Amino acid sequence: MSAAVPYRRVVVDAPEQLRIETATLPAEVPAGHARLRPTAIGVCGSDLHVLGGHHPFVSYPVHPGHEVVGEVVAVGDGVDPSWVGRAVALEPSLACGNCRTCRRGKYHLCEDLRVMGFQAPGAMAELADAPLDRLHPLPDGMPAEHGALVEPLAVATHALRLAGDVRGADVVVLGAGTIGLTCAVVAREDGANVLVVDTDAARRQVAAERFGFQVASSVGEQAFDVALECVGNEAALRSAIAAVVKAGTVMVIGVHGHDPAIQAGWVQDRELRLQGTLMYQTEDVQRAIELLAGGRVDAGAWIDARLPLAEAQRGYDLARAGGATLKVLLVP
């Protein structure tokens, strides 16, 4: 029997309890899987919610890591050996493939969905195994660390795909964190006129100076065709609903830990479209890669810090500080 392979990974044992542990993987990669050596892992707002004890869909301990780029170092039976050495981005959703929504092609809404880094072990680690169909090759010449932005950018490409044609539309984005700004960038790429709203002055400055957006501290009196709510709290969602014109669209992108009280009367009377959006599908991931590889999205504008895996706690602290810090990468 081959010896197990030791590696280090981040574990959150309970709220506010993060540590680095040594674990092992079987020497043989499972059939249909590839073994990934992560080269960069993003610390996401959802990771902060897990550490803070505010994520509604996890049980501790949690092994985080879903914004991941890495190199394939080994493959299991049934996988072409030519995958070894490829740079890949991780699509962390694990679907059953058999439920009603999976059979309809909406695997990201699987009735038994597990997401690596939340309900399944993630890849904030020196090694990780993943099903081959969850790995997306990066084009030659694309800087490897830019692949860590594929996952958050795919959230935006999916949301804008669901929003529909926004060419020439007036779009307001509520929230200037990573997801808000990815949505703003994709909306602008799709031809929209974009206003970014955030109550935090430092984040408004980032949106204006790094990305060239018009910014505001509140929605104000202007009416918009589409509102992209990327905050995940009641006040932001109510502002989004109030901001759109009759027959306008409100995209609920932020994750709400509590059910918000909204203006249902407005939604009905004004024939508003209130659309939720969860994660992404393969076509959204592919578009995210194309935008990054083609230089349509400047990945460097998001990355503020790079830290070794051993300094994961510091990375979380930097990300939690918010303000002008958008994306912290852990580099094993």
Language model segments and positions:
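C-terminal hydrophobic helical "lid"/dimerization subdomain
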Residues: 1-5, 238, 282-332
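N-terminal glycine-rich cofactor-binding segment
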Residues: 9-28, 45-74, 89, 109-121
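Glycine-rich beta-strand-centered segment in the early N-terminal region that forms part
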Residues: 26-41, 55-100, 139-141
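Local beta-strand N-terminus motif with an aromatic residue
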Residues: 85, 223-224, 299, 312
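NAD(P)H dinucleotide-binding glycine-rich loop of Rossmann-like/cofactor-binding domains
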Residues: 94-174, 300
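Mid-domain Rossmann-like dinucleotide-binding core that forms the NAD(H)/NADP(H) cofactor-binding site
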Residues: 142-217
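A short acidic, Gly/Pro-enriched loop at the edge of an enzyme's catalytic core
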Residues: 219-227
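Glycine-rich phosphate-binding loop and adjacent beta-alpha segment
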Residues: 234-296, 331-332
